[in-house]
């Protein structure tokens, strides 16, 4: 059976992501697969590539042919170089580095959210106090007018 390693499209319109799959070469693009060996999401920055290296090595070893896009992904992850025994088996996969400033940014956002909550609650309390004071001010003249007016019987 002629097997290929290729991409299976997932996602929705204008937001596609792919699964790296091993499939019989005669099957449809999104047809039944033999094994899923990874994922590829081009929508993130940088693109997310996750391939099970041991399974990719196995399928390449038994003769599965990668499609052109999968060949490029295998080069980026270093699996193709490892399979061929070439230099640069570590690959050129870019990763998002969290870094030390990421925690500081998260803390700053949380502090800002708490300050915003406090400001909103203070504004609500102030508005409520003003409304109560205005209501009390309206009731006082009405009571005085009622006392001054003679009662008709």
Swiss-Prot record:
Q: Which SUPFAM superfamilies match?
A: Ribosomal protein S16
Record's compositionally biased regions (Acidic residues):
140-153
Q: Which UniProt keywords apply?
A: Ribonucleoprotein, Ribosomal protein
Q: Choose any GO biological process term that the UniProt entry carries and state it.
A: translation
Molecular-function GO terms, alphabetical: structural constituent of ribosome
Indicate whether Ribosomal protein appears among the record's keywords. Answer: yes
Query: Where are the residues of the annotated region Disordered?
Result: 130-153
Gene Ontology cellular component list: cytoplasm; small ribosomal subunit
Reply yes or no: does the keyword Ribonucleoprotein apply.
yes
InterPro entries xref list:
Ribosomal_bS16, Ribosomal_bS16_CS, Ribosomal_bS16_dom_sf
Q: Please name the Pfam families in this protein's record.
A: Ribosomal_S16
Family designation: Belongs to the bacterial ribosomal protein bS16 family.
Q: Which PANTHER family match?
A: 30S RIBOSOMAL PROTEIN S16, SMALL RIBOSOMAL SUBUNIT PROTEIN BS16M
Q: What is this protein's name? A: Small ribosomal subunit protein bS16
Record organism: Bifidobacterium longum (strain NCC 2705)
